[in-house]
Amino acid sequence: MDRAAIAADSDSGLADLSIYLAAGEGKLDPSRKPDFVKKALTQDRILRLESKGKGSLVVTSCFGCGANKSWDTTLTIVWRGGKFLVAGYSRDWDWNVQKADGSVETTLGGCDINFLTGRGVASKDLDDGKPVAGKFVPIALADWSDDSRPEPCEF
């Protein structure tokens, strides 16, 4: 059985992901070093770390977490070809900006990119998601950063 853990770096406050392969069923030996560490996976608040079907690991985080300016992000990680890959990326946002005249401008949207199939959808406002142009390919988890976020997932 594999294990994963998220911990905030004491200096930066960024979330570091540690993965332990073949960790067994019992308690994890605290002296064991992780098989893989992704430093600074996200600066957002981690909501969930889940194991999904076919051996994927899903990390869900949020910025603002329901505030006037917020988004949530889901990163799907898989083990393929001897390395960890980002297989999927989803992001939903609700961004409210108070204007000088007192009105509020709201930007809603979302994206869902499957790097394994090379396809994705994006939505703006309350529209249904539409396929996005481009070919998406898996990204090594070691190379992932917020700068790797696909263009359709920007707002």
Predicted regions and their residues:
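Short, solvent-exposed loop/turn segments at conserved positions within beta-propeller repeat blades
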Residues: 10-15, 68-71
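Beta-propeller blade repeat segments, especially FG-GAP/WD-type strand-to-loop junctions
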Residues: 14-33, 76-81
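Acidic/hydrophobic-patterned starts of short beta strands in beta-sheet-rich repeat architectures
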Residues: 1-8, 52-63
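Short, charge-rich amphipathic segments
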Residues: 4-13, 96
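Blade-edge motifs of beta-propeller repeat domains
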Residues: 25-44, 133, 138-140
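Beta-propeller blade termini
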Residues: 42-54
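Acidic, small-residue rich beta-repeat scaffolds with periodic aromatic anchors
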Residues: 55-155
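Sparse, context-dependent recognition of short Cys/His-centered cofactor- or disulfide-binding micro-motifs
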Residues: 4, 34, 42-44, 60-62, ...
